Curated annotation (Swiss-Prot):
Descriptive protein name: Probable glycosyltransferase WbjE
CDD domains to which the protein is assigned, alphabetical: GT4_WbuB-like (cd03794)
Pfam families cross-referenced by the UniProt entry: Glyco_trans_1_4, Glyco_trans_4_4
Family stated for the protein in its record: Belongs to the glycosyltransferase group 1 family. Glycosyltransferase 4 subfamily.
InterPro entries: Glyco_trans_4-like_N
Organism: Pseudomonas aeruginosa
Annotated keywords: Glycosyltransferase, Lipopolysaccharide biosynthesis, Transferase
Example GO molecular function: glycosyltransferase activity
GO biological processes: O antigen biosynthetic process
Note: The O-antigen locus is highly variable and differs considerably between different serogroups of Pseudomonas aeruginosa.
Amino acid sequence: MARIFVVSEYVGANQNSTGYYWEKIIGKMQREFGGLTVIFPLTAGETPPVVSPSVDQECFKFPRSNKNRLLSRGLAQIFQAFLFSVKLTSRARRGDVVLSGTNPALLLMTFPLLRYALGFKWVLLVHDVFPENLVPAGVLKKDSIAYRLLRRLFSFIYSSADRLVVIGRDMEALMKEKVNDPRSLVFISNWACEKEVFPVPREDAPFINIPEWKGKRVFQFFGNVGRLQGIENILSAIQLVKNEKAAFAFIGDGALVDSVKKHALEDQCARLRYFGRLPLAEKNFGLAACDVALVTLEEGMFGLGVPSKAYFSMAADKPILAVMEKGAEISRIIDETGIGWNCPPNDPVALARLIDEICELDLSSLGGVPRSVLQQNYSEYISLEKFAACVRPLLSESKI
């Protein structure tokens, strides 16, 4: 009988947003099909992810590396990819179905060979598109030899999967140009669980009950404060905002946190605050701590990623100010549903002007709309049913 394997660096909601989604997928696969095995690493000193006891777990110990040192990180990924491969080789057989993601990238590179050697069916969940995403990150130049070589390599890797699950329609269009058979592509959007993420009054978020912010319109960035999120563009725009009602809250962690902290310290008007990283248990209070959610991507990220924070903000019933290229998945949702506003990336003047305008708007007409859009189109139930529908025919083929 064919079995299902999930192979992922993160498998628990207590780890990060990637772990959140994999935990939900794991639960659905186990309930729908049974016979599920999850292969994942456990870094020294890390809190173990919460995995259902009904799921067969193949966990391997993994030494902690310094993510800020390229050599240390590279060696760690090589070792991790090797351990993943050993575990999968010892368990998976012809006809089994293996689900994996695009990280770590070195593990992704081993899958075409493993699939050929072991004969399993491969479902790849695409959160990141390599090597295109290395260009806006400043790691590679598009006209470099390394980029062209990696593009050919990853086109081969993506084409080796039986099913490619993409999380945005812009990503789907990009991937059609990369793979040999576009019929392998399946669009399944990100989601948020409406039972776990729900609206909370802003005044109930204790950490933003700042006397100076009474009557302010709070714009919030919540999540990964990373290099691909267009952070510098937001910070530049904040300096240009003229409306005195505007206030800005940053919650999260990432490579550009120090830059956010620096701007907060230099902000003489005290309208920019950094609140650190929130525990998962407090996510609803964090999402409540604003009037408008800022969802941003760096210029050049079209088709390369979809911020999951947008779906959580919808569940929390917050309108969205999307700063990204036109036609990107979140920008497209806003155009289709009217749950917010769009602004092009890398244009702080335009962003500041739009923030000034939003500060003068009556937002009461948007009450209930973002959450309703999520419930009707981007609920957990809808997306997980699509995952089951994606895997089911592969299992049926294995029985023949």
